[in-house]
Swiss-Prot record:
Entry keyword annotation includes Transferase: no
Entry's Gene Ontology BP terms: proteolysis
PROSITE patterns (UniProt xref): CARBOXYPEPT_SER_HIS, CARBOXYPEPT_SER_SER
Entry's EC annotation: 3.4.16.-
GO annotation, cellular component aspect: extracellular region
Lineage: Eukaryota, Metazoa, Ecdysozoa, Arthropoda, Hexapoda
Annotated signal peptide: 1-19
Residues the record marks as carrying a glycan: 135
Active-site residues annotated for this sequence: 207, 391, 448
Family stated for the protein in its record: Belongs to the peptidase S10 family.
Coiled coil: none
Protein name in the entry: Vitellogenic carboxypeptidase
PANTHER family given in the database record: SERINE CARBOXYPEPTIDASE CPVL-RELATED (PTHR11802:SF472), SERINE PROTEASE FAMILY S10 SERINE CARBOXYPEPTIDASE (PTHR11802)
Species name: Aedes aegypti
Leading EC class: hydrolase
Amino acid sequence: MVKFHLLVLIAFTCYTCSDATLWNPYKKLMRGSASPRRPGESGEPLFLTPLLQDGKIEEARNKARVNHPMLSSVESYSGFMTVDAKHNSNLFFWYVPAKNNREQAPILVWLQGGPGASSLFGMFEENGPFHIHRNKSVKQREYSWHQNHHMIYIDNPVGTGFSFTDSDEGYSTNEEHVGENLMKFIQQFFVLFPNLLKHPFYISGESYGGKFVPAFGYAIHNSQSQPKINLQGLAIGDGYTDPLNQLNYGEYLYELGLIDLNGRKKFDEDTAAAIACAERKDMKCANRLIQGLFDGLDGQESYFKKVTGFSSYYNFIKGDEESKQDSVLMEFLSNPEVRKGIHVGELPFHDSDGHNKVAEMLSEDTLDTVAPWVSKLLSHYRVLFYNGQLDIICAYPMTVDFLMKMPFDGDSEYKRANREIYRVDGEIAGYKKRAGRLQEVLIRNAGHMVPRDQPKWAFDMITSFTHKNYL
């Protein structure tokens, strides 16, 4: 999800001599403001941590129940968990219990990318129970992942979406801190819903979530806290996980026919220079080079747009049609009755439009890798990497590039493994490969946001992974 105003990815940072201009990947997908339209009518935000600390668990659950006519057809809960009292840092969440087999269904956390993209994009645009039509009506999604999962959508890191902090020191500057905050959140979540503690626990996300998901998994794996979380696996879609091994854009775009040899030379030179900058820890230099290729510098047209004609790099078939899908989500979230119903009051919604503080604070993290964490996690848990065939910014070949270079239990098996056809109800949904605890999947006719482009196949894929171990 990159160039996605609610969804995903690299969020490279471009610096001028006087200020920081942040690449805003979701800008084209989420337009407008989610500020309350009628101040004073949105109720108060619900902070659950004080209630939990006082042992008022049932009261907290009752207060967290989402109460809005357009959302009442599906049981759900929302509110804030404080993860850093010193800086008043709070994570907003929206929990949707499983529709079927509630007593045994696995838990599935969803983390959007960005960084700075709200997971409410994933909830309303990709895999949640609700979809908002252009006429502002709310419809139920046919292939909602809550049908057989307890879904938890978290605005992560602090400062994303409705999540907030009162201090610059409350923002995350690295993935360790992201994981720590998510760990503090989930510990409180299980106090609020203790009946879920023994359920199989999975973490999923896309784009820059390719870092957040392993960060959360690694924090759980290393935690000595009791009771233990029943972590079973991780699922990463079009993930930005090992950046320096996922920058081979020149070859990829050339093979697609989107650039010629001159364009390939420019991409190869600039990505090589970015890698050199990153290796000497000059992230400002590295980010600026990638920014120039994909989003433009100092108000100038990006090189990608100059040579391809496209601004969006989510789907090379749809091109800029992808960016013209006008989302009404922002307007929906500005409705005072909605805000009151989901317990956010008049708190601002940080949507990555304009100054993206989350991305700014994580600018030194942009090109860092979490591959060593993935490698360690693969020794204990199942990990699914899936990609849309038509994605550019987190393309399938680049995911394979980093997986082929990553040492893990089963790496030699992965290099030898044959790919199989993945079918859903007789249709060719894509291709799959398995080695050790690693599952790799390519979904046909999908771009950066696989669940949105191919909802039926994505639903089958995630269900097979969480319920049958492998596809």
